[in-house]
Amino acid sequence: MLMPKKERKVEGEEVIRVPLPEGNQLFGVVEQALGAGWMDVRCEDGKVRRCRIPGRLRRRVWIKVGDLVIVEPWPVQSDKRGDIVYRYTQTQVEWLLRKGKISQEFLTGGSLLLE
C-alpha cells in the first residue's frame, strides 16, 4: 500500500510574533553544553548563569552552543541559576539585530546590548 507524499508549503514567509523577554527575563547566549539538560549561558547583564532546559523544551527544541535564548533567573540564586524559556531561530535573531533589540557584539562575546 502506497502512502501519498506530504505536501510542503514553500510559498512566502510565515508571519509569527517574535517573543521578547518580559519581567525579569533576559537575553542570553549559550556558551557551553554541560549535559543532563544544563548549559552555561552568558546573559545580557554580564553574568554567566548555569541554566536548565525544562522538559517541555528539551523534547522539542535542540539548543546548541552559540544559540540566542531567553533566560528566566531563579528566585533563589538568581545570579547563578536560571531556566531557558525560549530559543530563537536564525531568522528571528536577524530580525532582533535589524530592530536594535540586541547588538552583534553581544552575540559574538561582548556584553553590549542595545535598547
Swiss-Prot record:
Keywords, comma-separated and alphabetical: Initiation factor, Protein biosynthesis
**S1-like domain residues:** 14-89
What does the record give under GO molecular function? RNA binding; translation initiation factor activity
Q: Does the keyword GTP-binding apply?
A: no
Q: Which Pfam families match?
A: eIF-1a (PF01176)
Function per UniProt: Seems to be required for maximal rate of protein biosynthesis. Enhances ribosome dissociation into subunits and stabilizes the binding of the initiator Met-tRNA(I) to 40 S ribosomal subunits.
Q: Which family does it belong to?
A: Belongs to the eIF-1A family.
This protein is called Translation initiation factor 1A
Q: Which organism is it from?
A: Pyrococcus furiosus (strain ATCC 43587 / DSM 3638 / JCM 8422 / Vc1)
